[in-house]
A protein has these predicted regions:
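Active-site-proximal segment of RNA-dependent polymerases
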Residues: 39-100
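Short acidic, glycine/Ser/Thr-rich loop/turn "cap" segments at secondary-structure junctions
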Residues: 18-27, 49-59, 88-93, 163-171
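Phosphate/oxyanion-binding active-site loops and adjacent basic polyanion-contact surfaces
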Residues: 34, 63-66, 174, 178
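Glycine/proline-rich, flexible active-site/cofactor-binding loop segments
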Residues: 22-53, 146-156
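Conserved polymerase palm-domain catalytic core
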Residues: 80-201, 205-222, 240, 284-311, ...
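A residue-level signal for conserved active-site and pocket-lining positions in enzyme catalytic cores
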Residues: 38, 70, 174, 250
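Polymerase palm active-site segment centered on the conserved acidic dipeptide of motif C
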Residues: 196-200, 206-280
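A structured, charge-rich N-terminal accessory region that forms the first stable segment of a protein
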Residues: 1, 7-8
């Protein structure tokens, strides 16, 4: 780093299959140290400019925080569910794979020059540029069958989405810089007079009493995203009266109550079935840990009856033998 000869090492690349096929890169241990070096210096500065309505990869926030914020936004905007208001949910198409590396590197560099006061500012600027512009697909070891990549769209893989585009899903800096990039969008929505809004990665909602105001926001958002090299996923546009509810970060939020989406319940049931089939203590312990995790998640939703129903699927011999 001191001699400006640092180059990221070989990454591990694989494809996860659930809930959908997705390409992931894992950086080498040495590179992760560099990622944390960057994060430790920039995260406190990013927190000072981030909107309070950005929920992912931030201390004290997360999926549950976002769901609770959405629930409260609906309650406030509808005046305790007594007045009409509307929910609009938008999504970005191929967000991580669409990020323009050069544009992101320039934005981060300008930010560092303006806000960072440390003596190692030159090192930080250098490392950020190297890390952002790095193409891990050119030096990686694949740990999944090649047939898995055939199931990915061309714009879902760094190998095929085009030169100079995309950041590796799985790296710490990708999450941090993605938030930084979309911070522009968060404040734009706020400045357009939408008080009730929130974002988790590339999934964001807006709530307002005037549905025409919400619809008028869409082309403005589309225009802003185009300047960042991004675009909306037109197939995931959602617009409804608040009484219809909305799905957000794996939960379904309705007036005064929250439910878990079907996929989570299906996975919960699968964990119960693994427990029933377990034939040794290790497998039982693994299944029980998974079940406890789902119970911890479901306790934050209005799912008491569902929890009882699923737990009743545990076969009696499990209690007797273990």
């Amino acid at each position: 780093i001191n001699t400006r000869q640092y180059a990221p090492g070989k990454s591990i690349c694989f494809v996860v299959t659930r809930p959908r096929y997705r390409e992931v890169f894992a950086a080498s241990f040495e590179d992760r140290i560099v990622h944390h070096y960057i994060a430790l210096r920039l995260t406190p500065l990013f927190e000072e400019i981030f909107s309070e309505r950005t929920f992912n990869c931030r201390k004290g926030k997360g999926q549950l925080y976002g769901v609770n914020m959405l629930k409260e936004d609906i309650r406030q905007c509808s005046n305790n569910y007594t007045e009409d208001c509307y929910i609009m949910k938008l999504d970005l198409k191929g967000f991580f794979m669409s990020i323009d590396k050069k544009l992101l590197a320039e934005m981060v560099d300008r930010f560092i020059v303006k806000y960072y006061k440390g003596e190692d500012i030159d090192d930080l600027r250098y490392l950020c540029r190297v890390v952002i512009l790095h193409s891990p697909e050119k030096n990686c070891e694949r740990h999944s069958p090649l047939s898995y990549w055939e199931k990915l769209d061309k714009n879902k893989s760094l190998f095929t989405n085009g030169e100079g585009k995309g950041v590796a899903i799985g790296n710490l800096f990708a999450q941090i810089f993605a938030n930084f990039l979309l911070n522009t969008l968060d404040w734009f929505i706020e400045n357009e007079g939408i008080e009730h809004h929130g974002r988790y990665v590339d999934d964001f909602y807006c709530i307002h009493k005037d549905k025409e105001k919400l619809l008028a926001l869409v082309p403005k958002v589309r225009e802003l995203l185009a300047k960042l090299g991004l675009r909306l996923n037109e197939k995931k546009f959602y617009f409804q009266h608040y009484s219809k509810g909305v799905e957000f970060t794996g939960s379904i939020v309705k007036p005064g109550r929250v439910y878990t989406c079907n996929r989570t319940i299906t996975n919960f049931i699968a964990a119960i079935r693994r427990l029933n089939k377990a034939n040794n203590e290790r497998k039982v312990l693994h299944a029980v840990c998974s079940i406890n995790s789902y119970l911890g998640l479901l306790r934050h939703t209005n799912e008491y009856a569902m929890r009882r129903k699923v737990l009743n699927m545990i076969e009696p011999h499990i209690y007797k033998e273990y």
